[in-house]
Amino acid sequence: MGSQPEYGVHAELNVPVETRDGTALATDVYRPADPDTNAPIEESKPALLDRTPYGKRGRMERHGEWYAERGYVVAIQDCRGRFDSEGEYYIFVDEPEDGYDTVEWLADRSYCDGQVGTIGTSYGAWVQSALATQDPPHLEAMFVNQGAANGREATFRHNGTFELRWLCWALTLGGGFAKRALGNSDIQTLLADVDVRDVLADGPIHRGQSPLRHIPNYEEWAFDIMTQGATSDDLWQSPGMNFERHYDGMADVPTVYAGAWYDSYTKATCDNFAALADRKNADQFLLMGPWTHGWNGYPLPSWNKPYSGELAFGEAALRDYQETRLRFFDHYLKGEDSWDDQATVEFFRMGTGDGGRTTEGRLFHGGEWSTADEWPPGDVEHTTYYAHGDGTLSTAEPDSEGGATSYEFDPKDPVPTLGGNCSSYITYEPREENLIEYPLAERNLHDITGRGGFDQRTREDTFGAEPPYGPLEHRDDVLVFRTPPLDEPVEIVGPIRVRIHAETDASDTDFTAKLIEEYPPSEGFPNGFALNLADSICRARYRGYRDEPDFVEPGEVYEFAMEPYPTANIFAAGHRIRLDISSSNFPRFDVNHNTGGPLYGDREYRVATNTVHHSATHPTRIELPVRRA
């Protein structure tokens, strides 16, 4: 149990925090106050900092008040160039120094006892790690919920490809609330009326020809992340974009890295914990639930979400987010024993459910919490499952020297995305009212891809799908390898590795891998349920996680390495483990045009013949982190 509410709240709004370059960052400060008079108390208290690009008012106000009532000073700040803060906005680049300066400013206030902790989700998690690369002297603890690690490898970009969610974000939550849009109703109206689905369907945008042309600084950073793929590009050296390069110098403070199996930052969360637990002396924790990206509760953030996409987990999945964070800070900033029983690693094991159909129409996948001393847990061993020419997947190595399967990959007919580790694939609902009658901040957002676990079959509302709708495995460009029904359960916990041996007749193409649990037909799901657990992609020119592009020679066999995001799941007896291989997953990732042209913005298209090998010489395989019984 954490601190109880015992104070009133005194708020100081739009306090300017001047950074080293003279930019004023607008900050709301919530202080514990006398409950009768609401006058701020004289006693200094530890402070919590939450930096956001989404505006510090609205739901954030109650967020600040909640902690102030429990004895914390809370500073909620608009990031540079957003809402009430001065400066030009370029995504993440200025966050390390701005965060450092704010931590030290806050620690220097008379009402702060010199200890500063940081909180925030998504962008608010990213900026925490960014400021930690600068090692502020008064930073004492961090609760990093669903944040990044290496923007080039698995956030903005992904093994050479581009995660199109950032283009969606630029057109909606980013650009819609840019300073220029907030100050010009015509620009904001134009952005509000954009149907992002049309933008995605029309193919790559071009400079000066999309709605982003009206907010040039947003167009600049959007095209930078879409077109710059090499490690040597200055963008990916920045401590605001790539924390992995700066792990050794990061602040050595107690930190919780929290995330979810269907979050867009799953791999980054686990990577941050594993790397920093090994490097730092301060306590590091990992907490992974079964949820999707973001929080699910207003006005306060919450993990009280018992489902992800078409999956239901039951009440076991519910978690009090605010109380968990409070217990952590009470321990490390107030010296209370509220965190003593917390395991170093706590995670949700999905897959203990009966597979029945819930009243909401979801599949009851179930699950339960588990703990470990390290990540991945010490009782995990990677077990290799090999693809075979007859479509089977087994631990037996291929015994033939030959064996390959070909398909045609048409970039104009990509494989549709059906859920998974998605976020920000969104568009504003169309409205007839103007922005005065119906402000942009109040408009609903439509999800384009879905997020979480989904039966891998298209339907009428699947973006990019065309009739006849049905299982993705029925497509000619999707190769499927599956085990026989399992004789006993198989539990996996940890990182996943895929190695595809393949060739193409193009100078560049993509390969994708998707791990699936196949539920057999049942009364609730007479066609079975192909549950996506994790997926990844590899752009040929960046195969092997290359730092610089290297185009392939048509007809030559290469190994394409991928790391689908970590997970924790129990494959039940009678179910099958399945590996799907293809060359696209759209719009989760941008589509390779197969021409060897520009990394983004190619105007030409080419159908590629891609061949996956599954022989003794060139074994295609997936390595699963199997937990010993």
Where are these regions (language model features)?
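Cap/lid segment of the alpha/beta-hydrolase catalytic domain
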Residues: 33-108, 154-157, 299-312, 473-475, ...
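Alpha/beta-hydrolase fold nucleophile elbow
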Residues: 110-122
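A catalytic-pocket lid/entrance helix-loop region that shapes and gates access to the active site
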Residues: 119, 126-195, 261, 280-327
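N-terminal cap/lid segment of alpha/beta-hydrolase-fold proteins
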Residues: 1-43, 482, 486-488, 548
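C-terminal, loop-rich substrate-recognition/catalytic regions characterized by aromatic stacking residues
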Residues: 191-195, 200-209, 303-629
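Accessory cap/linker subdomain of secreted extracellular hydrolases
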Residues: 61, 69, 133-249, 414
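Short beta-strand/loop motif that positions the catalytic acidic residue
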Residues: 257-259
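Active-site-adjacent alpha-helix of alpha/beta-hydrolase-fold enzymes
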Residues: 267-284
